[in-house]
Amino acid sequence: MTTPSPSDALLIAGKRYRSRLLTGTGKFKDLDETRLATEAAAAEIVTVAIRRVNIGQDPNAPSLLDVLPPDRYTLLPNTAGCYSAEDAVRTCRLARELLDGHNLTKLEVLGDERTLYPDVVQTLKAAEQLVADGFEVMVYTSDDPILAKRLEEIGCVAVMPLAAPIGSGLGIQNKYNLLEIIENAKVPIIVDAGVGTASDAAIAMELGCDGVLMNTAIAGARDPILMASAMRKAIEAGREAFLAGRIPRKRYASASSPVDGVIG
């Protein structure tokens, strides 16, 4: 039996991770639920919205770092809520200052409040500036294969195409675009946004994605802790299925028991 080995680890910016499930820290009812869900997901990389979550900006308020310490988790500060390259770059620099020179960041520059689709022009502009400034950029983008390749060429360490609009729970809406991105990439491709349940995560991994990032699908579930556990198992199952190789789709039946050698 073949099982994923340590050499199958997710590699981002030179660091290896056992878990291919990345989780967010927003929308939970409190910090304790955030901690429990993160543990149930077995996530190693957790995203933090610098403009919304306290990681030291307010010394008088509870800090996320109290429940998700940086010596145990890789914190991935993100630019959620930014609508221009300038705001995104400024937010990343603030995060680097708060986290003592931490360069890994998740870039997202939104186009409008209704769809939360990425503004690809501003995203490209911000990515170029951040890479030049020494940041290791994981970038949220559309499922456009040409744009994904351009972001890779700029120097982003991971490209994160959406499966569907943020928080929609619609699942993967265009798997053929996603496949095109995966097949032409030389950096990790991590689905970001749109996952609604465990089967969505499994499908993303079966397609060959390197990982999945989610927040609402877990935090918005009736039982976030149980859903985090389900997502962990789905990611693992999807990855194993991808490595094992699915059978070809056929129009007609194919008997599982051969005719040759039938008794009688």
Curated annotation (Swiss-Prot):
Where, by residue number, does 1-deoxy-D-xylulose 5-phosphate bind?
Answer: 167, 193-194, 215-216
Q: Name one GO molecular function term.
A: thiazole synthase activity
State the active site.
106 (schiff-base intermediate with dxp)
Coiled-coil-forming residues are: none
Q: Please state the gene responsible for encoding this protein.
A: thiG
- What InterPro entries does the annotation carry? Aldolase_TIM, Thiazole_synthase_ThiG, ThiG
Subcellular locations according to the entry: Cytoplasm
**UniProt similarity note:** Belongs to the ThiG family.
Per the record, the pathway is: Cofactor biosynthesis; thiamine diphosphate biosynthesis
Q: Name one Pfam family in it.
A: ThiG
Q: Has UniProt tagged this entry with the keyword ATP-binding?
A: no
Q: How does it assemble?
A: Homotetramer. Forms heterodimers with either ThiH or ThiS.
What's this chain's function?
Catalyzes the rearrangement of 1-deoxy-D-xylulose 5-phosphate (DXP) to produce the thiazole phosphate moiety of thiamine. Sulfur is provided by the thiocarboxylate moiety of the carrier protein ThiS. In vitro, sulfur can be provided by H(2)S.
**Catalyzed reactions per annotation:** [ThiS sulfur-carrier protein]-C-terminal-Gly-aminoethanethioate + 2-iminoacetate + 1-deoxy-D-xylulose 5-phosphate = [ThiS sulfur-carrier protein]-C-terminal Gly-Gly + 2-[(2R,5Z)-2-carboxy-4-methylthiazol-5(2H)-ylidene]ethyl phosphate + 2 H2O + H(+)
Protein name per Swiss-Prot or TrEMBL: Thiazole synthase
Instruction: Look up the record and give one Gene Ontology term from the biological process aspect.
Output: thiamine diphosphate biosynthetic process
Where is this chain primarily localised? cytoplasm
Any one Gene Ontology cellular component term annotated for this protein = cytoplasm
